């Protein structure tokens, strides 16, 4: 990180001076919009001494995707909303997701089943001739390839994403519970 040199003839604001004096030994972390606004207002004046500058591009690269999307205050929802609000948000989004999933699932099942039925009908009437020996041979090849490629180790990408999901669920138990309950209700309606 680079440091800025002081400008001559300037006096720092008292609140900013206290804040910056307490942060000189440790890296600069901003936890709320109020602190950020206070720092921005204080930086309009000039400071004496050396301060670290914050490279936002580097900070953004290190943040998880949900922090980039929702901002710094996107921690556990338990800190921001009441229990009823969390359950309501989770339940409504879960119900909507379950309802849409049910409708799309029915449509997809109908399309696949109808296509299979039409293929069977075309085969039965003689429009299509299926070489069942070739199909069986190809299926055996596919089974062998799957046995060869099969491994008991989970890829690291899958493992890291699973850990992110588990962490999110642990931090937002009420929203997650409401979502799954709403999802089941949406699937049933």
Curated annotation (Swiss-Prot):
Modification sites for Phosphoserine: 10, 53, 151
Source species, domain of life: Eukaryota
InterPro entries in the cross-refs: FUN14 (IPR007014)
Intervals, Mitochondrial intermembrane compartment: 102-107, 186-189
UniProt GO cellular component terms: mitochondrial outer membrane; nucleus
Cytoplasmic side: 1-80, 129-164
Keywords, sorted A to Z: Membrane, Mitochondrion, Mitochondrion outer membrane, Nucleus, Phosphoprotein, Transcription, Transcription regulation, Transmembrane, Transmembrane helix
TM region positions: 81-101, 108-128, 165-185
Topology in the lipid bilayer: Multi-pass membrane protein
Molecular function, one GO term: phosphatidylinositol-3,4,5-trisphosphate binding
Tagged with keyword Transferase: no
GO biological process annotation, one example: regulation of platelet activation
Function: Binds directly and specifically 1,2-Diacyl-sn-glycero-3-phospho-(1'-myo-inositol-3',4',5'-bisphosphate) (PIP3) leading to the recruitment of PIP3 to mitochondria and may play a role in the regulation of the platelet activation via AKT/GSK3B/cGMP signaling pathways. May act as transcription factor that regulates SREBP1 (isoform SREBP-1C) expression in order to modulate triglyceride (TG) homeostasis in hepatocytes.
Protein name: FUN14 domain-containing protein 2
Organism of provenance: Sus scrofa (Pig)
Recorded name of the encoding gene: FUNDC2
């Amino acid at each position: 990180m680079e440091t800025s040199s002081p400008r001559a003839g300037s006096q720092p604001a008292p609140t900013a001076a206290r804040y910056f004096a307490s942060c000189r030994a440790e890296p600069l972390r901003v936890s709320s919009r109020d602190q950020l606004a206070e720092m921005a207002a204080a930086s309009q004046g000039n400071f004496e001494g050396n301060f670290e500058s914050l490279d936002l591009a580097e900070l953004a690269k290190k943040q998880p995707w949900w922090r980039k999307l929702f901002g710094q205050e996107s921690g556990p929802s338990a800190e921001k909303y009441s229990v009823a609000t969390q359950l309501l948000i989770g339940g409504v989004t879960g119900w909507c997701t379950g309802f849409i999933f049910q409708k799309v699932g029915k449509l997809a099942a109908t399309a696949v089943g109808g296509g299979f039925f039409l293929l069977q009908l075309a085969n039965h009437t003689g429009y299509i001739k299926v070489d069942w020996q070739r199909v069986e041979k190809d299926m055996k090849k596919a089974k062998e390839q799957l046995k060869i490629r099969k491994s008991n180790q989970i890829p690291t990408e899958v493992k890291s994403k699973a850990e992110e999901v588990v962490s999110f669920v642990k931090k937002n138990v009420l929203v997650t519970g409401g979502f799954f309950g709403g999802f089941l209700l949406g699937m049933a309606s």
